[in-house]
């Protein structure tokens, strides 16, 4: 991973935490970890009588299929799936979520965000933080915890510990997802968003995760499945395909990504990861390429020219869907985008076009 990623640390040899952690996992006793997962499932299986044994936070994507496969088919648990709806759904994403329920015979409780509030907060977070998906991301973090407790379900299953996989605030491997809501992926809302009275604190209630104290008092045990089984996004995709998951190419060939199966539920949502390119000089293609290199599927030399070409692209469909939803003109959109270009990595010509001052794999070019 590049050294511009926030929170990422490096050792004295210049190796990033994500690569160090990946190497450490090659010596992990996965049989022992798998048996630990079995013990946890044995503890909760049947704990609610004929009710739900566990809750799984899902989107309908490849990892959601893998999680549900492990918990339902392998562990023989009776899960309830908890999901948050999108601003706009791709048809592929919608069908994949339906497939998750149909193929694994699971019920899904989905929180459909308040569209009026979503439109307002999407615009505010875009203008103020360059994080247009702040509102749905906050719901994704908070909703499963609250809903699991409301249902009386004590085992909550998440997929990947992103802080450990990619490096971040909590760069220590742990089975517990108790601290996930405070891992800095989603920051608290800004008080100034309330100043014009378009929204109130009541509108933001669903974005607030229960405290650690609340979770412990209830007896909630949130876990990362990636602690107990090897986590590989390509392998997860191959497993998901065997259970009916479909990639996006049947519907849409997008720009700016080197795969067709990751984050395919919504187009407008992808503006958020693209903004990483403006701020930190890398985006989705870098993330995926780094994983493929760590998995041993590709070499760094193979991926550098691909990332150089792909990472900078913003799919027009993303812009169209986003502007349509927030009721913003393309001119207004690009004026806000200009605000988020990092002048350390980009320079703007007299016509307003931005040009990178760096080369992938080399850094800044003087």
Across the structure, where does each feature detected by a protein language model lie?
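Nucleotide-activated chemistry modules centered on ATP-dependent adenylation/adenylyltransferase
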Residues: 1-54, 70-366
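Short, glycine-rich nucleotide/cofactor-binding loops
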Residues: 54-63
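Hydrophobic positions on the alpha1 helix immediately C-terminal to the Walker A/P-loop
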Residues: 66-67
């Amino acid at each position: 991973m590049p050294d511009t990623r926030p929170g990422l640390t490096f050792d004295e040899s210049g190796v990033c935490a994500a690569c160090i952690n990946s190497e450490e996992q090659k010596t992990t006793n996965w049989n022992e970890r798998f048996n630990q997962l079995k013990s946890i499932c044995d503890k909760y299986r049947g704990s609610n009588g004929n009710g739900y044994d566990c809750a799984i936070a899902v989107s309908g994507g490849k990892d959601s299929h893998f999680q549900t496969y492990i918990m339902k088919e392998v562990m023989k648990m009776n899960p309830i799936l908890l999901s948050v709806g999108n601003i706009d759904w791709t048809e592929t994403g919608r069908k994949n979520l339906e497939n998750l329920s149909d193929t694994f015979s699971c019920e899904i409780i989905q929180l459909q965000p308040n569209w009026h509030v979503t439109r307002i907060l999407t615009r505010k977070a875009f203008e103020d933080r360059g994080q247009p998906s702040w509102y749905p991301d906050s719901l994704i973090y908070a909703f499963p915890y609250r809903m699991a407790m409301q249902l009386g379900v004590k085992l909550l299953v998440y997929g990947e510990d992103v802080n450990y996989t990619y490096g971040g605030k909590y760069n220590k491997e742990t089975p517990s997802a108790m601290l996930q809501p405070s891992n800095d992926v989603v920051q608290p809302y800004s008080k100034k968003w309330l100043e014009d009275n378009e929204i109130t604190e009541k509108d933001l209630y669903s974005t607030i995760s229960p405290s650690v104290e609340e979770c412990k008092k209830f007896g909630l045990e949130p876990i990362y499945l990636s602690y107990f089984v090897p986590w590989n996004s390509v392998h997860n995709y191959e497993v998901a395909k065997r259970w009916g998951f479909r990639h996006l190419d049947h519907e849409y060939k997008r720009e700016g990504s080197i795969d067709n199966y990751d984050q395919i539920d919504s187009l407008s949502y992808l503006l958020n990861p693209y903004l990483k390119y403006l701020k930190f000089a890398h985006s989705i293609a870098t993330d995926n390429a780094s994983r493929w290199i760590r998995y041993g599927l590709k070499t760094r030399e193979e991926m550098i020219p691909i990332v150089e070409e792909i990472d900078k692209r913003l799919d027009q469909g993303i812009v169209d869907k986003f502007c349509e939803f927030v009721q913003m003109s393309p001119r207004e959109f690009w004026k806000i985008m200009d605000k988020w270009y990092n002048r350390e990595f980009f320079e703007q010509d007299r016509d307003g076009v931005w040009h990178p001052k760096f080369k992938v794999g080399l850094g800044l070019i003087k």
